[in-house]
Amino acid sequence: MPIYFPATYSTLSSSALASWLEAQYFFADVRCRLLVMGVGDTYLAETATGRYILRVYRPSHRSREQIIAEIELLLAAKEAGVSVSYPIADRNGQHLHPFSAVEGERHAVVFSYAPGNPVSILNETQLRILGWEIARFHNVSSTVRLNGSRWTFDPETTLLRPLERVKPYFEDLPEEYDWWQQAAAKTITHLAQADGSRFSAGFCQFDFLPKNFHFDGDALTLFDFDFFGYGWLVNDLMTVRVHLDLDVHFGRLTREAAGQAFDSLLAAYREIRPLSDDEVAAVPWLSLGFWCFYMGFHSTHDVFHPLVQASQLKARTALIRKLLPHL
């Protein structure tokens, strides 16, 4: 029996996964190819009856219980009529599949395919559709009960812990790291003054950038809930604002157009569920947590290590300071 050298990460064979899909699911003529490496490796499976997404999670980043919670959330959203990419059961009614890989047990889930394409600059109709769909998702995510394995989005998890995690990477950038610390302290102080007990809470997707939803005409599908956790639901609207701010910075939108776009999204959202002015006022402050949280994640994942090198961190800090001038 061969003895393999220990590994922390392996990439599963696309052809072997295609054969597995044919045996495990009611799929025929499966062609499988790797799309992207991330927290989970994402494969496109093309079959005789349609396309599907296969995600193989990394055990270092997602536990079995955390993946089960994601499955439960998406099935609840689908049951409620929310347009999401949802888990597909196999011949035996199972959604979660263990694989014995070199680094240990990995888990895989097959998802429905999100038709259409990402749209970077949304028109008025698309903005309203997105606002409605996020609100419908929040109607589910604010009431669903899961297994307790997911994390919470709060100042500790979005600011303090990520900053501590990336501190070694800022060793040669003391001024930049000082700015992050001061900005985090200012944000925490400001948010503490808000009456957060009156903010709607539930499970947040925390990454509603255009790369995570597709439009096919006026039909919208939300996907990639891998980072979802519990927190103020306005965090999800904040992530849309983050993208609009980037559009302004890179000259794709004027500041006035970005403001109008966000107002359209909020108006549509409020047609489905309430949203207070205080929650909206928190958006610029919550934005720092978005950038800090994902910066911390980049330091934990080898694929993203180039993003935490000194040159990248210096450029990223300069960008965030321009995007968030109130800090």
Regions found by a protein language model. Name each.
Residues S120-D178, A201, S311:
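A cross-family kinase active-site recognition segment
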Residues V234-R273, L288-F304:
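Active-site activation/catalytic loop segments of kinase-like enzymes and analogous catalytic loops
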Residues G38-T49, I53-L54, P87, I188-N235:
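Active-site acidic catalytic loop and adjacent metal/ATP-binding pocket
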Residues M1-R31:
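Juxta-kinase regulatory segment immediately upstream of eukaryotic protein kinase catalytic domains
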Residues P59, G93, G104-I121, L163-E171, ...:
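A glycine-centered beta->alpha junction motif in the catalytic cores
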Residues T47-L146:
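ATP-binding pocket architecture of kinase catalytic cores
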Residues Q24-E46:
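ATP-binding glycine-rich phosphate-binding loop
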Residues I3, F293-L327:
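ATP/Mg2+ or Mg2+-diphosphate-binding catalytic cores
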